[in-house]
């Protein structure tokens, strides 16, 4: 079986709350680390989430 182009990643909050989202990313089209603004329910605000590895 061929290995797929998409990797599972974890988007972790920069607010320091420990909240995270998981998603997939096409590693061929986006080799750089992803950063996106999403809602953090712990602080109840939109904050930046940065890509980290899933352990």
UniProtKB/Swiss-Prot annotation:
GO terms for cellular component: cytosolic large ribosomal subunit. One of its GO terms (molecular function) is structural constituent of ribosome. Keywords: Ribonucleoprotein, Ribosomal protein. One of its GO terms (biological process) is translation. InterPro entries: Ribosomal_bL33, Ribosomal_bL33_CS, Ribosomal_bL33_sf, Ribosomal_zn-bd. HAMAP family: Ribosomal_bL33. PANTHER family: 54S RIBOSOMAL PROTEIN L39, MITOCHONDRIAL (PTHR15238), LARGE RIBOSOMAL SUBUNIT PROTEIN BL33M (PTHR15238:SF1). Belongs to the bacterial ribosomal protein bL33 family. This is Large ribosomal subunit protein bL33. It comes from Burkholderia cenocepacia (strain HI2424). The gene is rpmG.
């Amino acid at each position: 079986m061929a290995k797929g182009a998409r990797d599972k990643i974890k988007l972790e909050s920069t607010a320091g709350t420990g909240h995270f989202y998981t998603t997939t990313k096409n590693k061929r089209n986006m080799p750089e680390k992803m950063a996106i603004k999403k809602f953090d329910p712990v602080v109840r605000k939109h904050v930046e989430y940065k890509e980290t590895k899933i352990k």
